[in-house]
Amino acid sequence: MIRTSSAAKAFAIAGAAAILLAACSTESAGSGGASGAASASSSSGKDPAASCKAPSKPSQDALEYGTLLPLTGSLAYLGPPAIAGAGLAIDDINAAGGVIGKDVKISTATDSGDSTDMTVSSSAAQKLIAAKVPVVLGAESSSVTLNVVDQITSNCTIEISPANTATDLSGYSSYYYRTAPPDTVQGSALGQLVVGDGNAKIAFLVFNDAYGTGLRNTVQKAVEAAGGSVVYGGKGKGQEFPPGQTTFSSEVTAALAAKPDAIVILSFDETKSIVPELVSQGWDMSKTYMSDGNTADYSKDFDPKTLLNGQGTIPGSDPKAAFKTKLTTWYKTNEGKDLHDFAYAAESYDAMVLTALAAEEGKGTDAGTIQAHMASVSGAEGGTKCSTFADCKKLVDAGTKIQYTGPSGVGPFNADNDPSSAYIGIYKYDQDNKPVYQSAIQGSTK
């Protein structure tokens, strides 16, 4: 029986706080300004964590995690799978004896919000830094991470995201990692999928967000390399819409006027307003493509068959049935709800396990020690492959080099702290507006 874990308690407290904050807060700085400021910092080429290092005597305290996950906002649907993945990982780690003989826990869970109000993530980052946790899981939005990564990693705290894909984040900080591949991998796969289906003229409906524009650029590059053309929403055209927009009549009208063969929607929760507008203007939804930001279960949002045969991509191969069962059981037991989406659950699980294994190999739970062993346990230096914390821990404790190969299927970290390889899952919508896994393409980062 799975007990109500410390992770579940932390998430419950964070959820209550997020609801209160959402009720009291107002819209403030948009993603353009916040992301722009963060990108300007990254362009300097300076490592925010350059002064951080492992202590001469590694910490022997119990390992504690912080989380920065979307409990509110346009990415809130990605919160449950990440929570389930992280919580299940905590339980599995502790069932195998914990780290350096002590149980691990999530002690500080916070709400990342989304890019429409960066004050939410800025406040959360301050809370996480004050809590002195060595590792923070999150954020899921690339724009949110760009808003807080300097703040978090300059304080010598590891930030590891299960879902960030913006290329701007590759090699951003020596204390920043991700278990999702950069957009160069997904963008190439999505572009090839669209053109491979016989579509020559492509329109983008894309929001002005680091994630949206970055992915659009890589998809466009793949489309044009395959002989296709972009007729609306392309790079440099100034046709992006702001995050949080709720009406799309003019954008859809303009996109359809360009007579595209296919439309690629790159957005988050805005998709729930874009799709009805496309339908009302007579668009064939089977010619619609989406990405990990919006390839989700819309069975409760649209009439049956609305998205039938539309397609989308999500980094990561489809989790095995047994792993999904564990996730749904954990979530139902600890959160009291059904788990409907699995996007980035495996990546969240792997992020927790990798950091725990790094602490075990380094025989210490401080951020510096963990950071020094992250590449090693991921297999960057070669090693015996192992797929569970329990099996890997036995090897590590015996002094054996390992390569952790978890449910997400990502390869070892490269020099930029990105996965060196990853799978991109291809999904097609059924008559209930649910994405159904079709196949996976493996790609390498560059």
Task: Give residue ranges: language-model regions.
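C-terminal motif of bacterial Sec signal peptides marking the signal peptidase cleavage site
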Residues: I19-A23
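Beta-alpha junction/loop-to-helix N-cap segments that form part of ligand/metal-binding clefts
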Residues: T4, S31-A34, Y77-A84, G97-S170, ...
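Bacterial lipoprotein signal-peptidase II cleavage site
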Residues: C24-A40
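Periplasmic-binding protein-like
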Residues: L128-E140, I160-P162, A203-V206, K259-F268, ...
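Segments of small-molecule ligand-sensing domains
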Residues: K337-D341, A359-K434
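Extracellular/periplasmic periplasmic-binding protein-like sensory domains
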Residues: L278-M352, A359-T365, Y429, Y437, ...
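Extracytoplasmic "Venus flytrap"
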Residues: G45-G87, A109-M118, E140-S141, F207-G212, ...
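Extracellular/periplasmic Venus flytrap/periplasmic-binding protein
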Residues: D114, M118-T119, S123, A166-Q281, ...
